[in-house]
Regions:
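Ribokinase/PfkB-type carbohydrate-kinase core domain
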Residues: 1-11, 73-88, 100-142
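Beta-strand->loop->alpha-helix junctions that form or flank phosphate-binding loops
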Residues: 60-65, 82-92
């Protein structure tokens, strides 16, 4: 039995660091780029796994059949999170993040992708076997 299962959004953040957000129609040079997992399932699940490595944690959701989906599954697995209930289809949901070095502010543009296809039929209620389930970012799911 798992202690907790996180269900919902599995997202990859595509972060572009820039000096400042340019005016509309103008160009900003990207200083550096990186990717990071995001969304409720990844953020909360990984944080909890770090705080208590003895917890049995599971993930439920949908990622794409792409490199971002691979990254999400590898990252969760590396933190000891069971990904056996994560489905693969479509394109992994992502957020483009413009992070301004000058102000520290961030601007987000989100692509629904696989998470937009996630619904109650994707939750294996008969196989969850957990003490607690947390469903996050419900309003981002379509």
């Amino acid at each position: 039995m798992r202690d907790i299962v996180f269900a919902g959004n599995l997202i990859v953040d595509h972060i572009k660091c820039i000096e400042a957000l340019p005016p509309r129609g103008e160009l900003a040079k990207i200083l550096h780029v990186y990717r990071s997992t995001g969304g409720c399932v990844c953020n909360t699940g990984i944080d909890l796994a770090i705080l208590d490595p003895e917890l049995a944690i599971g993930a439920v959701g949908v990622v794409g059949r792409d490199a971002d989906g691979d990254m999400v599954l590898e990252t969760l697995t590396r933190h000891g999170i069971d990904v056996s209930q994560v489905l693969r289809r479509s394109v992994t949901s992502f957020t483009d993040v413009l992070a301004e070095r000058s102000t520290g502010s961030r601007t987000f543009v989100q692509f629904g992708g696989a998470c937009a296809e996630f619904d109650i039929d994707d939750v294996p209620l008969d196989k969850l076997d957990c003490k607690l389930i947390h469903i996050g970012y419900v309003l981002l799911m379509e």
